[in-house]
A protein has these predicted regions:
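Patatin-like phospholipase
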Residues: 1-39, 47-215
Length: 215
């Protein structure tokens, strides 16, 4: 195990299709980090990595876009969001549980892996950044619901409600898509960060329309 370096997956929506190969390569090379952090799309990478499912790690952001239930305008008009979030997270995991399909999630392997997990969501009502760990994920549904909450892109997905609280994409929180501060608070000084943005990228300030929508 790699105990002195935190593995951090940056969020980034479908840009995570490029970093899915990194997840698979880490698993293929037996690089087992003891602490794994992720936000938004990085939360999906986090749980796939901890479950040690190489094929699912690759397929989650590549093959899945071919799923007829993936989303689109029809899904948006039906109230499911442009990305059919419930189907993509809890739906697929529960429908394929116990099968040998590529997108089946091995929750037993996830629990058996001793690696610590840290993902974050953004409380839409309070503006609070909320962190979840394995203790908040006793079932696969609990886990997938939190991954979905961390990945809920405003305007593209309906808000995710957990215990009466409304959550949106964790990238809107204090970590800005990279759980570096959380890893530092956990005592880490060395980090293996899987980026979805090029080196030197700086997010531009929101324009007038987004500011009006999210104020």
């Amino acid at each position: 195990n790699i105990d002195d370096v935190a593995l951090i997956f940056e969020g980034g929506g479908m840009r995570a299709s490029y970093t899915a190969g990194v997840v698979a390569t880490l698993l293929e090379r037996g690089m087992d980090f003891s602490h794994v952090y992720g936000i938004s799309a990085g939360a999906s990478h986090t749980v796939n990595y901890v479950s040690r499912n190489i094929e699912r790690s690759r397929a989650s952001f590549t093959d899945l876009v071919c799923d007829p239930e993936f989303g689109g305008v029809g899904s948006l008009l039906a109230g499911r969001g442009f990305f059919n979030a419930h189907h993509l997270y809890e739906g697929i995991a529960e429908d394929l549980a116990g099968t040998d399909e590529i997108m089946a999630f091995d929750f037993d392997a996830f629990l058996a892996n001793k690696a610590e997990v840290h993902i974050e969501g953004f409380d839409w009502d309070t503006g609070e950044t909320v962190a979840w760990t394995k203790t908040d994920m006793p079932t696969m549904r609990d886990m997938m619901l939190r991954v979905r909450a961390s990945s809920t892109m405003p305007l593209f997905m309906p808000p995710t409600v957990i215990d009466g609280r409304t959550f949106m994409d964790g990238g809107m929180g204090t970590s800005w898509g990279i759980c570096l501060d959380a890893a530092r608070r956990d005592g880490f000084e060395r980090f293996f960060i899987v980026r979805t943005q090029p080196r030197g990228y700086r997010k531009k300030p929101l324009g007038a329309l987004p500011r009006a929508v999210f104020r």
